[in-house]
Regions:
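Structural signal for the C-terminal ends of transmembrane alpha-helices
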Residues: 90-98, 157-166
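Hydrophobic cores of alpha-helical transmembrane segments in multi-pass inner/ER membrane proteins
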Residues: 82-88, 145-161
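Long, glycine/tryptophan/cysteine-rich extracytoplasmic
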Residues: 28-51
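Interfacial helix-loop-helix junctions of multi-pass membrane proteins
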Residues: 12-22, 119-140
Length: 184
């Protein structure tokens, strides 16, 4: 569900032209948004130094900036949350030796795909922080396609875990699982 939410928020970020509002990429320290007027003005001044503000959004107010900043911030925070929701159980199950070799390979690939998405996202944003303040459509397509591939591969890994022979006899559990999968 988080991957789906991430893709939807990414789409909203694109449609609201919010993706270039956060001009710095701090993997760990960037988790805290501006919390007071001074910090908001600092973030806005950083944005003002880039061509998107100078050439397109030069009439943008601090209030409007906060709106576009929100969508990009939310997109990045869901990415961080997704990473934590994945990595913590992954490490736990590795330590407890609860994953077979096939699942270790599959989940390691998922981990790499998730990390790659973050890198591709920043690569895409960097393409718009130049003289031509618009992200590369090619990089955007790569970002979206790899998101879909990650989503599909996640299902490919998870479905055999959900629909095992042991669980197929429990019709209530199977029905609930199908409903849950539809909700995702």
């Amino acid at each position: 569900a988080l991957i789906f939410i991430m893709v939807v928020i990414g789409g909203i970020t694109r449609l609201t032209d919010s993706g270039l509002s956060m001009v710095k990429w701090n993997l760990f320290m960037g988790a805290i948004p501006p919390l007071n007027e001074t910090e908001w003005k600092e973030a806005f001044n950083l944005y003002k130094a880039y061509p998107e503000y100078q050439k397109i959004n030069f009439n943008c107010t601090l209030s409007e900036f906060k709106y576009i900043y929100f969508w990009e911030y939310l997109h990045r925070m869901i990415g961080r949350l997704l990473g934590l929701v994945f990595i913590i159980p992954f490490i736990y199950f590795l330590i407890k030796k609860r994953l077979n070799k096939k699942l270790i390979v599959q989940t390691s690939i998922l981990l790499l795909m998730g990390a790659m998405q973050g890198a591709i996202g920043w690569w895409m944003v960097k393409s718009g922080l130049v003289n031509n303040p618009d992200v590369s459509h090619y990089r955007l397509a790569v970002h979206l396609i790899t998101a879909f591939l990650t989503f599909a591969f996640t299902f490919w890994v998870v479905l055999p875990l959900i629909f095992t022979k042991e669980r197929s006899g429990n019709t209530v559990l199977l029905g609930l699982t199908k409903i849950l999968m539809l909700l995702i």
